[in-house]
Design a protein with these regions (language model features):
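Core alpha/beta catalytic barrel or barrel-like domain that forms the active/cofactor pocket
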Residues: 3-6, 45, 110
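Alpha-helical scaffold segments that mediate packing/assembly in large oligomeric complexes
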Residues: 18-26, 33-97, 152
Length: 173
């Protein structure tokens, strides 16, 4: 656990001039905003540090890595071998990869994606990919398989505390 605290002080002059009601209310609102902001920044830190090798998990690897070691030997990846911008192909590949994730004994665990998490810069791309009934960016009349198959039943959410403009994440069940 981590204790986070912030406070404000009112001067004796403010008390004598009966300014404590007005100042106290304003400062209290500012403290509440500051705490809400801090909670969001700390919550987003897991994703913001997901590719940083300075922040490792129990296996000695960052959260998103191409070489998580398996107890039975071998490795497992939960990020693409080659970085890819968010588009139909990269999203389909990510969903396929998720469906073939394995446990520490290298057995498929049959995960499904439930929600995509994107920074503000990708919200329009995410909306087109998940809400269109037809394929995005083609003149063909093909269905949007991601939408049609309900591959991300909870849709997407925009996290305003993700500074990387092209990183996207998929929450699983």
């Amino acid at each position: 656990h981590e204790t986070i605290s912030l406070a404000f002080a009112l001067t004796e002059e403010a008390m004598e001039d009966n300014l404590y009601d007005r100042l106290g209310a304003r400062y209290t609102r500012a403290l509440a905003r500051s705490m809400a902001h801090t909670k969001q920044v700390k919550a987003a830190a897991t994703l913001n540090n997901a590719f940083d090798s300075s922040f490792t998990g129990g296996d000695g690897k960052e959260l998103c890595a191409t070489d998580h070691p398996l107890a039975g030997g071998g490795t497992f990846r939960n990020e693409p071998s080659t970085a890819a911008d968010l588009n139909e192909t990269s999203l389909e590949n990510a969903l396929i990869d998720i469906s073939t994730f394995v446990d520490e004994r290298n057995m498929i665990i049959a995960l499904r994606g439930t929600k995509m998490i994107v920074p503000p810069q990708l919200q329009f791309v995410a909306d087109r990919l998940l809400e269109s009934t037809l394929r995005v960016g083609t003149a063909d009349n093909d269905i949007n398989a991601i939408n049609n198959m309900g591959m991300l039943p909870d849709g997407y959410t925009v996290n305003h505390f993700l500074p990387d403009p092209d990183a996207f994440f998929i929450k699983t069940d």
